């Protein structure tokens, strides 16, 4: 749940934590054995949350119940810029990489589990990470195309293994809802929805060039790589328009 000691702002009513050190917060949780659901918020996810049916089990509820919601997307940063707040992006893939590096320094005490991606992708990504961080210990991995009949076995595996870091790459909103429903199985784990990060780590896709990242244009590179996403990208201008209109009428929202 959202904790009172962390500064919480709102983006069109959706909560966001504005911290100086997200990695430090998660490092502290890992040391203390305090689990967390981490949401990497961007404008597309914000629009999906606003459009999701209200109530228990919705994307909006999953985000509201998360322990840490970080400003991942350029649209979220743009929203705070309109409000006169200087906020820096915290890309979810970079946050996950830093957490994995911390786990590699500790070793068996903080085992990792990858869930998601096409068959073979999570395994390839884990192999790359074991080369990068020889001290990193994997409790296991599973691709994201298991059948509903196979899911209980996965859940039982997580319950038995109790990994401390669980990265879920099922895409939005599926990964957020899945973590929301099942995080109680591993209460000491850091659960992070990582989208297509496994594909990048496995070498199936690439991140935008550094200059595009610095200009907050990573979304354009993703559209270039995956043109079939163009319908989903329509959420970006909608988000920008709604942000301007909302802040004009309700400056504090």
Question: Where are each of the predicted segments found?
Answer:
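N-terminal nucleotide/polyanion-binding subdomain common to many enzyme families
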Residues: 1-89, 93-94
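A short helix->loop->beta-strand "cap" motif at the edges of active sites that frequently abuts
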Residues: 35, 108-109, 186-189
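Short glycine-rich anion-binding loops that position phosphate/pyrophosphate groups of nucleotides
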Residues: 42-45, 75-76, 170-175, 197-198
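A short, gly/pro- and small-residue-rich
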Residues: 53, 57-65, 176-196
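A transmembrane-helix-recognition feature enriched in membrane-embedded lipid enzymes
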Residues: 77-80, 208-253
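Short, flexible loop segments at boundaries between secondary-structure elements
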Residues: 143-147, 187-225
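Proline-aspartate-enriched helix->loop->beta-strand connector
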Residues: 158-172
């Amino acid at each position: 749940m959202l904790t009172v000691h962390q500064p919480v702002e709102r983006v069109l009513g959706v909560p966001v934590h504005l911290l100086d050190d997200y990695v430090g917060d998660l490092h502290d949780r890992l040391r203390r054995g305090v689990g967390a659901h981490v949401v990497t918020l961007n404008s597309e996810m914000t629009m999906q949350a606003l459009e999701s049916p209200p109530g228990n089990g919705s994307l909006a509820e999953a985000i509201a119940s998360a322990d840490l919601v970080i400003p991942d997307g350029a649209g979220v940063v743009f929203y705070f810029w309109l409000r006169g707040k200087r906020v820096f992006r915290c890309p979810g893939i970079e946050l996950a990489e830093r957490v994995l590096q911390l786990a590699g320094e500790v070793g068996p005490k903080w085992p990792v589990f990858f869930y998601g991606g096409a068959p073979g992708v999570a395994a390839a990504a884990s192999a790359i990470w074991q080369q990068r961080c020889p001290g990193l210990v994997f409790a296991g991995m599973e691709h994201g195309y298991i059948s509903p009949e196979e899911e209980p076995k996965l859940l039982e595996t997580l319950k038995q293994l109790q990994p401390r870091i669980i990265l879920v790459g099922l895409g939005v909103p599926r990964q957020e809802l899945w973590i929301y429903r099942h995080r109680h199985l591993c209460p000491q784990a850091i659960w992070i929805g990582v989208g297509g990060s496994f594909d990048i780590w496995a070498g199936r896709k690439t991140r935008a060039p550094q200059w595009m990242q610095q200009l907050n244009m990573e979304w354009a590179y993703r559209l270039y790589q995956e043109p079939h996403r163009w319908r989903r990208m329509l959420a970006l201008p909608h988000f920008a328009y709604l942000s301007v209109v909302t802040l004009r009428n309700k400056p504090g929202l």
